Structure formats: structure tokens, C-alpha cells
């Protein structure tokens, strides 16, 4: 995604006649590459991003190395420099829009419930959902200020809710009820998430992953299996399955594998206070595909708005102290782990979806008015324009100090997320996180 970002800067600069001296994948010493014209295309030693170097940037002017030629970056009119600065984020945002748009045009398997209105199939006894008055068969017609919410919207809103009441409008066999629901807080990987113990109507539990050495693997459960009954009772939900597993006794499962129906027996494994069977569930899926470009573009737009909304809520909770920045922000190691996890759960489709999410976040982040980032360049251009109205200009000393502040901030942020990633790896090595245990139930 960083390469796409830098390519945006590069190609727009080339189109506008600005000399590009270096296009680098990575930072630090040059490992290898090639030269075409005035540009050195290189791979560098530290694979944590990349950069584009234009002729006649700030430091060259300060060091007296600028020749003042017409193809230097700072010799360009403000509108050209603005287009070059904004091109990187725009390329990222466009990429983020194109990924889900292309995906739905090609077609992919998606949870069948994501786009459906919330109709409750199971409410866990004793849960906050039951205490609020929700029952099996209820249809949620309003969730906060959202009318006819889908399961996707419901899930996203609940997971970022940290103990606040949510007003609900419920249709129960034609009777309209006004209820309030407060999600319970569950800690996963030492980070809080909102949880509501209810589910859509299920006809089976799909198997997305099977953990090595688990009861599921020992019993012969495989990825793609569909569990239709447990101890002779039809599957009605994941919480029903968990309740039976927590009894700690051998279970008998009816499993659909392709055209076959199998009977599988297994005994849950005890870990701490819990009994685990050792697989990750998958909801029923359907082929999501359209031949309409307009529909596909709308899907791409909605997908990105959803990501922005969730990201905004998480950052708001970080700044308000409700959520830990140390647990919420990931660096290169964390992103690599998320990529592997996305592939394990959804294959290359999951990886591509994650790349779109990262591309969007990278594009939006770079528009923030922080020195060194593209938003900082745009801010400087705005200041230049305002000063120009009264006959003043920015001094090179101010530019240098502005860039130095930004450079320090970016280094501190990079160090922070890399240390976080390393700390999480060490914690997992010595102490298995609750999130993983929850996943295996």
C-alpha cells in the first residue's frame, strides 16, 4: 500500500514535469535497482515503506545544492505542488474503493446475514440481551438512530460500544416495543470490546479453522465442515454449542462434508476455567456478485464509509482513555500477523480486503496536517498562500524546523508501534491471550 501511495506522488510529478531523483521501496542503504533517465528506481535495506525524492527539496536549498532549475519541486507553482502532495493519499483512497468494487463484480463468498435485517435467532439465557427484554424471533427495526439495521451494522456498532445504553425499536409479531440494550464488556487480548449474546437464526455452524492438537482435530473435524446437530439437537446458535461444550463431556456431532453426512465424537479439552473444542466458526455464506457497475461502486463506497466510521470510533475511544493505544495500534509485525490471520480465515479474499482497509487508513492518515506527512505539505502550501496575500513568504529556516518536528513525531510513532508489536509477541509466548482461547471454544 505504501508503494501505491508513493507511486501516486511519482506519476503525478512526472506528468507535471517535476524531476524525480529517487523512487525507493524501503528506506536506508540502496540494495539494488536500476536507472531510467534521471530517476533511480531502487530497493533499500529497511522494508518499512518507501519514498520519492524530488529534485530541489527543502534540504537541498538549505545546503546550497539547489540549482533553481524549472523542474525542481520548490520551483513549481503552488497548484502543482498541491497536486503532487495530494496524489499519494488519493491513490490510496481510490485503491481502497476499487478493491471491494472489483471484488463484488467478480463475486465472492460473504456471510449470508451481513446484508440482512437483524432478526434474532437465539438469545443466551442470563445475558444482557435477555435482561433487556429481547427474545427469539424479535426483529430490530431501529438501532440508535439507524433504521432497519443489518447484522453487519449491528456487529460493528456493538463491538465498539463500551457500556453505553443503546435504544432499540423491536417488532415482536406486530407489537412495537421500545427497549434499551447495554452490551457487556469482554476483554480480548487485554483490550475491551462490546458483546451482545444473541445471534441470527442458524441452520448449521461452519468450520473456518481447526487448531492443531485440539479436540476438533482429534475428532476429525475439517475446514469447510458444517455442524448441523450436537448430541442429537439441531444447531440453533453458537452460544448453544458453547453451553454444551462447557459441560466438559464427550459430544456427538452430525457434520455435513460435501455430499456426505458424518457422525463425529470428541471430548472438549479443559484450559483454565473453560472447556474448548478448538475451531473457529464461520457463518453460512452466499455468493455476493453483481453485474451492475453502479451497484458495485455503491458497495465499494459503503464498505469504505464503514471502515472510516469504525476507525473514527476507535480513535475517539483512544483519545478519551476508554481504549488503550498500546493495544489498538499495530506496526509492521502486527500487520503481518493480521495478514496471516485474514488468509487463514478467508484465503486471498481476506488478504485483499485487509489491503483495502490498510490503503484507506494510510490515505486518510497522510492527509492529517502533521509535518512530514502529505497533510503537512498541504498545510505549508496553505500558509504560503495566506502569507502571499500580504506580500510575505515562508523562510527556509521555518520549513526546516517544521520538517524536523514532523520527522521526530513520525519516528516516535514508528518506535511506539514496533515496541507494541514486540511486546505482544513476548506476551503471547509466555501467556496465551484470552482472545485466542475465546476463538477456540
Regions found by a protein language model. Name each.
Residues 83-96, 353-367:
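Pore domain of cation channels
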Residues 2, 92, 96, 100, ...:
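Hydrophobic alpha-helical transmembrane segments in multi-pass membrane proteins
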Residues 103-142, 146-149, 192-229, 233-236:
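PDZ/PDZ-like domain segments forming the peptide/carboxylate-binding groove
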Residues 86-118, 155-159, 164-171, 175-211, ...:
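PDZ/PDZ-like peptide-tail recognition elements
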Residues 15, 50-122, 174, 377, ...:
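Internal alpha-helical transmembrane segments
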Residues 119-142, 154-157, 169-173, 178, ...:
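Low-complexity, proline/glycine-enriched hydrophobic segments characteristic of transmembrane helices
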Residues 68-79, 192-218, 226-228, 233-364, ...:
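Functional transmembrane alpha-helices
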Residues 1-67, 365-386, 390:
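Small-residue-rich helix-interface/hinge motifs
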Amino acid at each position: 500500500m505504501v508503494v501505491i501511495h508513493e507511486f501516486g506522488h511519482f506519476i503525478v510529478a512526472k506528468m507535471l514535469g517535476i524531476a524525480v531523483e529517487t523512487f525507493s521501496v524501503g528506506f536506508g542503504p540502496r540494495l539494488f535497482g536500476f536507472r531510467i533517465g534521471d530517476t533511480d528506481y531502487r530497493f533499500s535495506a529497511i522494508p518499512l515503506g518507501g519514498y520519492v525524492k524530488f529534485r530541489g527539496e527543502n534540504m537541498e536549498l538549505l545546503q546550497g545544492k539547489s540549482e533553481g532549475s524549472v523542474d525542481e519541486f520548490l520551483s513549481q507553482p503552488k497548484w502543482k505542488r498541491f497536486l503532487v502532495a495530494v496524489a499519494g493519499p488519493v491513490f490510496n483512497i481510490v485503491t481502497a474503493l476499487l478493491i471491494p468494487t472489483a471484488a463484488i463484480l467478480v463475486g465472492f463468498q460473504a456471510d449470508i446475514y451481513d446484508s440482512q435485517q437483524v432478526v434474532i435467532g437465539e438469545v443466551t439465557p442470563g445475558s444482557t440481551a435477555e435482561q433487556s427484554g429481547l427474545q427469539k424471533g424479535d426483529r430490530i427495526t431501529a438501532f440508535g438512530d439507524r433504521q432497519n439495521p443489518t447484522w453487519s451494522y449491528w456487529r460493528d456498532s456493538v463491538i465498539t460500544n463500551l457500556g453505553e445504553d443503546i435504544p432499540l425499536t423491536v417488532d415482536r409479531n406486530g407489537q412495537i416495543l421500545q427497549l434499551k440494550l447495554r452490551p457487556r464488556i469482554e476483554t480480548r487480548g487485554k483490550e475491551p470490546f462490546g458483546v451482545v449474546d444473541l445471534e441470527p437464526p442458524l441452520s448449521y455452524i461452519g468450520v473456518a479453522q481447526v487448531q492443531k492438537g485440539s479436540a476438533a482435530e482429534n475428532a476429525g473435524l475439517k475446514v469447510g465442515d458444517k455442524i448441523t446437530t450436537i448430541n442429537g439437537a439441531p444447531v440453533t446458535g453458537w452460544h448453544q454449542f458453547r453451553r454444551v461444550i462447557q459441560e466438559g463431556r464427550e459430544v456427538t456431532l452430525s457434520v455435513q462434508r460435501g455430499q456426505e453426512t458424518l457422525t463425529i465424537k470428541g471430548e472438549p479439552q479443559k484450559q483454565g476455567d473453560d472447556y474448548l473444542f478448538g475451531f473457529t466458526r464461520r457463518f453460512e455464506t452466499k455468493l455476493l456478485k453483481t453485474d451492475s457497475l453502479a451497484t458495485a461502486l455503491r458497495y465499494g463506497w459503503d464498505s469504505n464509509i464503514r471502515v472510516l466510521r469504525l476507525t473514527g470510533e476507535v480513535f475517539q475511544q483512544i483519545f478519551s482513555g476508554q481504549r488503550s493505544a498500546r493495544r489498538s495500534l499495530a506496526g509492521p509485525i502486527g500487520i503481518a500477523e493480521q495478514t496471516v490471520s485474514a488468509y487463514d480465515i478467508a484465503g486471498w479474499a481476506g488478504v485483499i480486503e485487509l489491503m483495502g482497509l490498510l490503503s484507506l487508513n494510510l490515505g486518510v492518515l497522510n492527509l492529517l496536517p502533521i509535518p512530514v506527512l502529505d497533510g503537512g505539505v498541504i498545510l505549508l502550501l496553505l500558509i504560503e498562500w495566506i502569507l502571499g496575500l500580504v506580500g510575505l513568504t515562508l523562510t527556509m529556516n521555518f520549513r526546516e524546523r517544521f520538517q524536523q518536528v514532523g520527522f521526530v513525531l513520525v519516528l516516535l510513532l514508528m518506535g511506539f508501534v514496533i515496541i507494541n508489536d514486540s511486546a505482544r509477541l513476548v506476551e503471547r509466548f509466555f501467556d496465551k491471550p484470552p482472545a485466542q482461547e475465546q476463538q477456540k471454544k
